[in-house]
């Protein structure tokens, strides 16, 4: 095909194009420098009549040459609905569909022309996958009207819900779940929607997914749980994802969530939350390091190490410290600040045991009973205790407020908040006293 022919195609003169086809019809499927064909040039003009003319005279709508643009994709890119319909009617190869970044009107044209809404491309992606990636709620709603399947996975094992949770789009996640999206599915890397939400989502999105999943402690292929992800990427969601059955789960390197929290950037608030919820400071990673070893290696901040030591002393007093040699750590014994702090912890616990707060119950019992309720399943004792606590809550709070127990005051206050929630379920008024 000569350059003159291309020039005349782009002129838009139908009669001139007809004359050229009549005189040079045997060249209608010949490419120019293997980069284009008469049909591709005709499509690029945006003139459906010229395109129809070429097809009528034998132009191949599925011209096979990887260097030449795909006719259907070319028509979609220039946004010509008429040419797209014309190509589809004439049997153009639709295996490229769907493609990213198609607007709502073009998708409607394609679907109305007979392409199935759940058509998969070479990567097994559907129109729904791309609409979610584009964060286009209106297109998503339209696709459901055409019967889009919410649970088709692509070659990476990603379901639509995986893409939505990576995009942190609450309304889209909500719609997918309402349409029956599976909340516990995993992609090829073992990531669940909750893994993605914990990594990329805000509190509302994580809570939404959490309300629809029955496995908060799912591990991906490298052993990471949603809680691990939250500690690394999304610390505001840590408390939401804490599950006492999985708080000590390890990844393939033997790291627990507490190990993660102790690596830079280190947040003492996150460490405090994990420890209060029974993160085990005795667990060693694959290199033989427990959390205190990790703290000395990566952080070496007195406040962090003291937080770990306070927990170790308290859990040891409860009788649940699995490795008591932690308190004999060389870095602790050789450091006057830390060894003195361990002594102060023990002294404060003695004082807690002597200080009565409700009948014969001591301040130490405030934590001890909570521990038994939380981890030993002793629910009867806590109910009796809380009924007594309800009448003595003001005095008890005052005792804690005056900071009589500087090391363990936050443990005690948190216990009271937790008790308040339990009492709320029992119909008590204590919840109102502690909710602030």
From Swiss-Prot:
Protein keywords: ANK repeat, Repeat
Stored InterPro entries: Ankyrin_rpt, Ankyrin_rpt-contain_sf
Spans of repeat ANK: 1-30, 34-63, 67-96, 98-119, 123-152, 156-185, 189-218, 222-252, 253-283, 287-317
Record-linked SUPFAM superfamilies: Ankyrin repeat (SSF48403)
Highest taxon of the lineage: Viruses
Keyword hit for Membrane: no
Protein name: Putative ankyrin repeat protein FPV245
Species annotation: Fowlpox virus (strain NVSL)
């Amino acid at each position: 095909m000569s350059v003159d022919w291309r020039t005349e195609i782009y002129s838009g003169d139908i009669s001139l194009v007809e004359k050229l086809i009549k005189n040079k019809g045997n060249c209608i499927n010949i490419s120019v420098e293997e980069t284009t064909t008469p049909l591709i040039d005709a499509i690029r003009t945006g003139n459906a009549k010229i395109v129809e003319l070429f097809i009528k005279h034998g132009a191949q709508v599925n011209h096979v040459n990887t260097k030449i643009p795909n006719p259907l994709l070319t028509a979609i890119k220039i946004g010509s609905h008429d040419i797209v319909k014309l190509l589809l009617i004439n049997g153009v190869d639709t295996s490229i569909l769907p493609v990213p970044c198609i607007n709502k009107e073009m998708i409607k044209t394609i679907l109305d022309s007979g392409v199935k809404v759940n058509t998969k491309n070479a990567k097994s992606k559907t129109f729904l996958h791309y609409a979610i990636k584009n964060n286009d709620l209106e297109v998503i709603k339209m696709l459901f009207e055409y019967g889009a399947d919410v649970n088709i996975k692509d070659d990476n094992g990603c379901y639509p819900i995986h893409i939505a949770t990576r995009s942190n789009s609450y309304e889209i996640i909500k719609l997918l779940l309402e349409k029956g999206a599976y909340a516990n599915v995993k992609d090829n890397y073992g990531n669940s929607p909750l893994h993605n939400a914990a990594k990329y989502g805000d509190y509302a999105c994580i809570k939404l997914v959490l309300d629809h999943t029955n496995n908060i402690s799912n591990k991906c292929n490298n052993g990471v749980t949603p809680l691990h992800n939250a500690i690394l990427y999304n610390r505001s969601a840590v408390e939401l994802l804490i599950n006492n059955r999985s708080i000590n789960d390890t990844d393939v390197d033997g790291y627990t969530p507490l190990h993660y929290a102790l690596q830079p950037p280190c947040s003492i608030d996150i460490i405090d939350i994990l420890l209060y919820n029974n993160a085990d400071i005795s667990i060693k990673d694959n290199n033989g390091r427990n959390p205190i070893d990790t703290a000395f290696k990566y952080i070496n901040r007195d406040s962090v190490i003291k937080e770990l030591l306070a927990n170790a002393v308290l859990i040891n007093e409860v009788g649940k410290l699995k490795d008591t040699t932690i308190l004999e750590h060389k870095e602790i014994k050789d450091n006057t600040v830390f060894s003195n702090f361990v002594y102060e912890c023990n002294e404060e616990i003695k004082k807690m045991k002597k200080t009565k707060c409700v009948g014969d119950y001591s301040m130490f019992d405030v934590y001890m009973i909570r521990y038994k309720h939380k981890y030993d399943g002793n629910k009867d004792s806590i109910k009796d205790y809380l009924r007594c606590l309800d009448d003595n809550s003001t005095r008890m709070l005052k005792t804690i407020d005056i900071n009589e127990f500087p090391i363990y005051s936050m443990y005690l206050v948190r216990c009271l908040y937790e008790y308040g929630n339990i009492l709320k379920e029992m119909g008590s008024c204590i919840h109102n006293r502690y909710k602030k």
